[in-house]
């Protein structure tokens, strides 16, 4: 994983009881810092930006996401250590996963193969089962949100996740990454949990071939292919291909659930 960016004069030296050592990234909700706790353990600290922190509705939705994410089995994602949601600004401290994203790993070393690909498939499907069991639809499952830690893959970034209570965590607008979005997600026909299964199929195709199955060029071209064209899955290993194809069915009712997907991967 690339090292953290240096801190600027506008960045805090500490947050709560944690020292801040660098920036790990910046997203729509805020900034993620690399920090250390009092025992010297590295952590990731997400600090909400003003737009989220000062908007009661967005803040409440973020709090709901955090509470739901805390229910997800810790071996599947970056475990949340502390959620200081009443501080100014609110921040969340999670486990720091020291490893590249799947996107970075494939770009550097090429497609996954053999036992490594099988482990990736099983572990990420297990993570989706745990995420859905916690009542969450991730909505942005993609190679950049799979970290390859020393002890296995972790699914991260629930920033646009939907808590399964009938309310989207941002709005009912289309959100996600087009190359890994399901047709019904693109068309705004609702966000069932099987959008994550479709995304899993896209991610496994990418992991095994180095290419997203609907391309990664212009957004209109990708969107058209997702909705209307068959996926490009040449190069997906024979043992994985039927499962990936089932996950990439345009009709969500014909896709397996995350649990059914996992059972198929395990040979049940």
Mark where each language-model region is.
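Conserved short submotifs of the Hanks-type protein kinase catalytic core
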Residues: 87-101, 105
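AlphaC helix of the eukaryotic protein kinase fold
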Residues: 47-71
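Protein kinase glycine-rich loop
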Residues: 21-27, 32
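Protein kinase catalytic-loop region centered on the HRD/HxD motif
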Residues: 124-136
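Activation-segment/catalytic-loop signature of the eukaryotic protein kinase fold
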Residues: 83
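Activation segment signature within eukaryotic-like protein kinase domains
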Residues: 120-121
């Amino acid at each position: 994983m690339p090292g953290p960016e240096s801190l600027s004069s506008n960045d805090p030296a500490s947050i709560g009881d944690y020292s801040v050592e660098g920036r790990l990234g910046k997203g729509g909700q805020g900034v993620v810092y690399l920090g250390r706790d009092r025992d010297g353990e590295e952590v990731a600290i997400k600090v909400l930006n003003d737009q989220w922190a000062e908007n009661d509705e967005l803040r409440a939705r973020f709090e709901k996401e955090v509470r739901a994410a805390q229910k997800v089995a810790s071996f599947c994602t970056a475990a949340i250590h502390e959620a200081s949601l009443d501080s100014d600004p609110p921040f969340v401290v999670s486990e720091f996963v020291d490893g590249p994203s799947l996107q970075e790993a494939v770009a550097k070393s090429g497609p996954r193969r053999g036992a490594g690909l099988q482990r990736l498939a099983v572990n990420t499907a297990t993570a989706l089962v745990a995420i859905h069991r916690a009542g969450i639809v991730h909505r942005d499952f993609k190679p950049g949100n799979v970290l390859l830690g020393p002890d296995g893959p972790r699914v991260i970034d629930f920033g646009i996740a939907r808590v399964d209570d009938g309310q989207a965590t941002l709005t009912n607008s289309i959100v996600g990454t087009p190359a890994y979005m399901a047709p019904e997600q693109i068309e705004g026909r609702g966000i069932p949990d099987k959008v994550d299964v479709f995304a899993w199929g896209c991610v496994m195709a990418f992991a095994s071939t180095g290419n997203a199955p609907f391309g990664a060029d212009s957004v209109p071209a990708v969107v058209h292919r997702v909705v209307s064209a068959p996926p490009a899955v040449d190069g997906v290993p024979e043992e994985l291909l039927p499962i990936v194809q089932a996950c990439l069915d345009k009709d969500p009712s014909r896709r397996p659930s995350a649990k059914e997907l996992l059972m198929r991967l395990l040979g049940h």
